[in-house]
């Protein structure tokens, strides 16, 4: 099986008005990403505030993404939760809409075991007929997919990849050792993009690519031919990545999507916007990177 995508996928933000999703600006943002070399659109994930979207909103967002993509780049739906039954229902609905794949997070709060992870992911994978990327982000879930667990899960024909947001490249090496080359690894940490690529990562599901899609894709392509030049690109992008870590994702990145005109600066409770001084700092770093051209 070929990989669902290689290169840079955008973990897309969801623009809001004060009380609703701004579908028009969502469409505009996706069009911008598609026109600037993004290789995949990941919708309703962490960055998209999927945990505070209604089922109707999630389906509407996926429909817009599918219209914009028009079959040219994969649309991947975030459908995971800590409720296996609910994850199956969301996954089936997304599949019916025509998405290309699913991003399914490890269950949080319940504190299951590694055996529980195998049962959870396998049950979801059995219920659909499209590719699944597992999503390991222990900072948000409190648990990690261990190599022995991944080795079992990777045998399922619908489980084709892993988004590794552990921030641990040694752990990545252990995971890579237990699967074959057809299994894809996608980075989930923008600050580790270059070493992740150099270690054989197939791509990155990126937050910063919401506003720097072509720059990140260029870095990915350059790694394969000139690691020193790729490192220069990585270092140029790093100040933006660093300033986007001043608060929990997606609070900072939405400052920049709003700055570029893709909706108001709104996040949904329990998230709250940054203070104006911090917003200004983010914009200043971004403008410096872009040479004041924005």
Where are these regions (language model features)?
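C-terminal alpha-helical cap/extension of soluble enzyme domains
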Residues: 7-15, 32, 36-37, 93, ...
